[in-house]
Amino acid sequence: MVLAVLIGVLVGIVLVSSLLLRWNEVRYSRKQGLPPGTMGWPLFGETTEFLKQGPSFMKARRLRYGSLFRTHILGCPTVVCMDPELNRQMLQQGEGRGFVPGYPQSMLDILGRNNIAAVHGPLHRAMRGSMLALVRPASIRSSLLPKIDAFMRSHLHGWAGDLVDIQDKTKEMALLSALRQIAGITAGPLSDALKTELYTLVLGTISLPINLPGTSYYQGFQARKKLVSMLEKMIAERRSSGLVHNDMLDALLSGNDGTRERLSDEQIIDLIITLIYSGYETMSTTSMMAVKYLSDHPKALEELRKEHFDIRKGKSPEEAIDYNDFKSMTFTRAVIFETLRLATVVNGLLRKTTQDVEMNGYVIPKGWRIYVYTREINYDPCLYPDPMTFNPWRWLEKNMESHPHFMLFGGGGRMCPGKEVGTAEIATFLHYFVTRYRWEEEGTNTILKFPRVEAPNGLHIRVQNY
């Protein structure tokens, strides 16, 4: 009797599961002209498979359905595009063709609806203008690079003789460097409090928007609330004190130079959170993976050291590097770009359709997301011969940055505005790291590359003076 009931329950579960899956397919298949694909479960879609399998999920569906297929991930019906030319066109055409940013609800809620990656139209132009003014070449030369140099010189002091988790060190480095440039915050109780909340916030941005205690989304959203409160207090103190700090927050609060629209406090806070988030993610991961790749490729490390010791010739030990030094770091730039490419620090970009859009004979309905999946472009042997090999020299052979399918920093009118200052930060880190130290990896260090690049148990190196 018990066995019969158990079998009945199991059969019932199978039938209900099959009906739910079938209902979700029929629900979306009513729309005419959709690309092929599957939609998974109601609400959850195929999010679990996507986050667990990552690139394997994408490759399997491309083999089955082609370079344009439909799925349901992160709470949204989504079309994945793995075609390099279609991706280039989407990024170039942007809003004029019906494509606006389409980041998942979790990211919108946690980074803020005014974050520069999510807004479009006049607000995006205003926020992008404000950000570009902060990171233009003149600002890097006169203000940002001197601060970056002083910070890196201090942060990398005294590592010799230690067993260092370079993942932790680069995370701390990226966050503290961003806080110093944006709001003049140095290491101390305030930076520690901000660091705790920012680490939690980052984990919540790629999650299902389920607002229940214990979920990554809930924790990330609570962290955002605390960060907003801290930043509101900081802004109020700046205004009441009247002191000049000569940092990014000062520039944003002081209004404009007559050419830009003034941002509200809410917009400034969302911009600051996004600046810290994007810089932290990209800079920390790229710096860590550059150390890893250089460890594994001694010839590249030797070439990099030569470039940086040549720069130090004629400088006193405490003399800072300047903008001309940074612009002369051609091999360093190649190492950074090759690290971004091979590690795939950014897997792709999300867009949303504002109207029905025709693409390769299919119709993408209004309101759907399009995942501009650029990861496989990084491994295309037609663009990058022997693509799985770390080869910085490939970036010196021709001007790869002008290649139409160069998408390491996005594309079109949404090319990452912080590209140069981010490159300057990583280049300065490498300058002091390779001229001061030699290192060896210790233990077994596992690297995961999806949904974000990380070393789950750390990346440990034994550091000695050079």
Swiss-Prot record:
EC number: 1.14.14.-
Xref: InterPro entries: Cyt_P450, Cyt_P450_CS, Cyt_P450_E_grp-I, Cyt_P450_sf
Transmembrane segments: 1-21
Pathway(s) where this gene product acts: Plant hormone biosynthesis; brassinosteroid biosynthesis
Catalyzed reactions: 6-deoxoteasterone + reduced [NADPH--hemoprotein reductase] + O2 = 6alpha-hydroxyteasterone + oxidized [NADPH--hemoprotein reductase] + H2O + H(+); 6alpha-hydroxytyphasterol + reduced [NADPH--hemoprotein reductase] + O2 = teasterone + oxidized [NADPH--hemoprotein reductase] + 2 H2O + H(+); 3-dehydro-6-deoxoteasterone + reduced [NADPH--hemoprotein reductase] + O2 = 3-dehydro-6alpha-hydroxyteasterone + oxidized [NADPH--hemoprotein reductase] + H2O + H(+); 3-dehydro-6alpha-hydroxyteasterone + reduced [NADPH--hemoprotein reductase] + O2 = 3-dehydroteasterone + oxidized [NADPH--hemoprotein reductase] + 2 H2O + H(+)
Membrane topology: Single-pass membrane protein
Disulfide bonds: none
GO cellular component: membrane
Compartments, record wording: Membrane
Keyword Cell inner membrane: no
UniProt xrefs under SUPFAM superfamilies: Cytochrome P450
Essential cofactor(s): heme
GO biological process: brassinosteroid biosynthetic process; brassinosteroid homeostasis; microtubule bundle formation; skotomorphogenesis
Residue positions binding heme: 416
Chief location bin: membrane
Protein function: Involved in reduction steps of the biosynthesis of plant campesterol-derivative steroids, ending to castasterone (CS) but missing brassinolide (BL). Catalyzes the C6-oxidation step in brassinosteroids biosynthesis; the conversion of 6-deoxoteasterone (6-deoxoTE) to teasterone (TE), 3-dehydro-6-deoxoteasterone (6-deoxo3DT, 6-deoxo-3-DHT) to 3-dehydroteasterone (3DT, 3-DHT), 6-deoxotyphasterol (6-deoxoTY) to typhasterol (TY) and of 6-deoxocastasterone (6-deoxoCS) to castasterone (CS).
Name this polypeptide is given: Cytochrome P450 85A1
Organism: Brachypodium distachyon (Purple false brome)
Protein encoded by which gene: CYP85A1
